[in-house]
């Protein structure tokens, strides 16, 4: 795969993008490629760091997390972004056809060459929303290419590659670990990645884990090439080849 590419990242919650792929997305943008982000829930079932339970509503948290998400996305530099309103904490039980249709819509609108999402294990956390995001991204990847699927959502588009987040460290992904095929050097972007994560102030309870992962991974983000319609070699330092 050569030339300018479009890469779509599909995740479950505001802050997933900063935790996992911010450095890679920044690097792709600096190299002249187009990046897009689809987040499936507003994160309104989580906690609000520094505030007592009952002192805020789910809708107030959703609005605040949306502001944080937009601020982080501005730093990362996504050309296109969508924040959907499927149930946080209940994505696994959301209507599968409707959620898949939303993913298909995004793929057909932005026409990515590459789609990235969580692995089937849910990025090591076994979080049901993360696992559901993997399933919906996988379904959308396939359905978007079919003229028979969701014709009301636009013309078919066949993305070339599907990547899952991965890690070479067993402590990060204790079960169903995806072996990394690609290691992206993001050392140059770690400062901005930190800034993006720090936008998510409501989720500061995860701050220690974020910095532990950052240190352990040594200036790299890892991916597993799950589907390759482009038939390129694995083991690359770029998602594009």
What feature does the model see in each segment?
Residues 1-8, 80, 89, 93-241:
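Metal-dependent de-N-acetylase/amidase catalytic core
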Residues 1-110:
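Active-site rim/loop-helix segments in enzyme catalytic domains that contact anionic ligands
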């Amino acid at each position: 795969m050569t030339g300018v590419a479009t890469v779509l990242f599909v995740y479950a919650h505001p802050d997933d993008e900063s935790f996992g792929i911010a450095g890679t997305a920044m690097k792709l943008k600096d190299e002249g490629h187009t990046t897009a982000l689809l987040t499936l829930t507003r994160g309104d079932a989580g906690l609000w760091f520094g505030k007592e339970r009952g002192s805020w509503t789910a809708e107030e948290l959703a609005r605040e997390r949306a502001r944080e998400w937009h601020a982080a996305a501005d730093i990362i530099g996504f050309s296109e972004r969508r924040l959907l309103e499927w149930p946080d904490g209940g994505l696994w039980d959301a209507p599968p056809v409707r959620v898949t249709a939303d993913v298909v819509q995004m793929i057909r609108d932005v026409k990515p060459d590459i789609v990235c999402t969580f692995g089937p294990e849910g990025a090591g956390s076994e979080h049901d929303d993360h696992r559901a995001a993997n399933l919906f991204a996988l379904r959308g990847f396939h359905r978007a290419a079919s003229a028979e699927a969701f014709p009301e959502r636009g013309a078919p588009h066949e993305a070339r590659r599907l990547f899952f987040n991965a890690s070479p460290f067993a402590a990060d992904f204790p079960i169903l670990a995806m072996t990394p095929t690609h290691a992206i050097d993001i050392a140059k972007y770690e400062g901005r990645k930190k800034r993006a994560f720090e936008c998510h102030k409501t989720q500061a309870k995860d701050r220690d884990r974020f910095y532990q992962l950052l240190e352990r991974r040594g200036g790299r983000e890892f991916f597993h090439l799950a589907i390759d319609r482009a038939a390129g070699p694995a083991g690359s330092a770029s998602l594009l080849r």
